[in-house]
From Swiss-Prot:
One of its GO terms (cellular component) is cytosol. Its EC number is 2.4.2.18. This is Anthranilate phosphoribosyltransferase. Catalyzes the transfer of the phosphoribosyl group of 5-phosphorylribose-1-pyrophosphate (PRPP) to anthranilate to yield N-(5'-phosphoribosyl)-anthranilate (PRA). Anthranilate 2 binds at residue 165. InterPro entries: Anthranilate_Pribosyl_Tfrase, Glycosyl_Trfase_fam3, Glycosyl_Trfase_fam3_N_dom, Glycosyl_Trfase_fam3_N_dom_sf, Nuc_phospho_transferase. Its cofactor is Mg(2+). Mg(2+) 1 binds at residues 91, 224. It comes from Bacteroides fragilis (strain YCH46). 5-phospho-alpha-D-ribose 1-diphosphate binds at residues 79, 82-83, 87, 89-92, 107-115, 119. It catalyses: N-(5-phospho-beta-D-ribosyl)anthranilate + diphosphate = 5-phospho-alpha-D-ribose 1-diphosphate + anthranilate.
Length: 331
């Protein structure tokens, strides 16, 4: 590790195979916490390269616990986190909204590392028991149209660095990696990123894959469509900037999207959205993220139709019923 750190301190970049080997060594416990923290710190001080990102991703996917749910052609809706905004669990709520609209979803998530509550925290608040058993995950897809994959069960390297990430409490390159390493390798993905350079990096990375994708970024720094500002959506060969008003939404204030101070607070907000008692801003931000996920699956549909499908799922109670069935089956 000493030689690797010297190389990085001298502003050199890692090759793809080199990055892959480093992540494998982290997962195998070959480096101590101080060495891993030093490595992470390097990537806080400069942008990660495409070769480095792909190498780290290669390692995680090679070491993953594989799960084959390809017959469902599922979508994952996931953000990098690390935007410092402490929003409620928008992407998780959007997942249940999309599932309620009839589209299969495989949500890959984790505990919050830089925020109060990650997707796994919300699931635990509902009594969900995590599993890596393919038959149980397949049954969840068949019965509820959604399955949840708790990242540490499927990616040993993510489990190994979890205490270090929590202690650092700032975004790291593992934030960038999380959305890229869903062990199912879903057919579709809606990915949220916290800055424009990462949007371009993700777009470039996904152009080499078979996954149909869209990458979103709100221009005021959110790693999802926040409706607080204009936002960019990038797909293979296309980028477009939208305003909330152009889609029929009022702009939100940042305070309206706050996730609270505890996992219990975040779970209450999540439940209010699912039950239809949340504020207009909270519901709208879930609807718009769900709509763009539906658009990834059905690119022929106008975005207005996708918004209508997402709204109907949330406001009719289909999303709530999907959550209820999911909790009953997986509790």
């Amino acid at each position: 590790m000493k030689q690797i750190l010297y190389k990085l301190f001298e502003h050199q970049y890692l090759g793809r195979d080199e990055a892959r080997t480093i992540l494998q060594n982290i997962a195998q416990g070959k480096y101590n916490d101080a060495q891993v923290a030093s490595l992470i710190t390097v990537f806080l001080m400069r942008n990660i390269s495409v070769e480095e990102l792909c190498g780290f991703r290669d390692a995680l996917l090679e070491m993953r616990v594989p799960v084959d749910l390809s017959e469902f052609a599922p979508i994952d809706i996931v953000g990098t986190g690390g935007d410092g905004k402490n929003t409620f669990n928008i992407s998780t709520a959007a997942c249940f909204t999309v599932a309620g609209a009839g589209f299969p979803v495989v949500k890959h998530g984790n505990y919050g590392a830089t925020s109060v509550s990650g997707a796994s925290n919300v699931m635990e608040q509902h009594g969900v028991k995590f599993t890596d058993h393919t038959d149980r995950l397949r049954r969840s897809m068949e019965k509820c149209n959604i399955a949840y994959l708790h990242a540490p069960l499927f990616n040993p390297a993510l489990k190994a660095v979890a205490p270090i990430r929590k202690a650092l409490a700032v975004r790291t390159f593992f934030n960038m990696l999380g959305p890229l390493v869903n062990p199912v390798i879903p057919t579709y993905q809606l990915l949220g990123v916290y800055n424009l350079p990462l949007l371009r990096l993700y777009t470039y990375t996904y152009q080499e894959s078979a996954t149909r994708f869209a990458v979103v970024h709100s221009l005021d720094g959110y790693d999802e469509i926040s409706l607080t500002d204009e936002f960019k959506v990038a797909t293979c060969g296309n980028e477009k900037i939208y305003t909330p008003e152009s889609l029929g939404f009022n702009r939100c204030r940042e305070s309206e999207l706050d996730g609270g101070n505890t996992p219990e607070d975040a779970a209450r907000i999540f439940d209010a959205v699912m039950e239809g008692t949340a504020t207009e801003a909270q519901k709208n931000v879930v609807i718009v993220n769900a709509a763009f996920a539906i658009r990834v699956i059905c690119p022929e549909k106008p975005i207005e139709e996708c918004i209508a499908l997402a709204r109907e799922s949330l406001e009719s109670g289909k999303a709530r019923e999907t959550l209820k069935k999911f909790v009953e089956l997986n509790g």
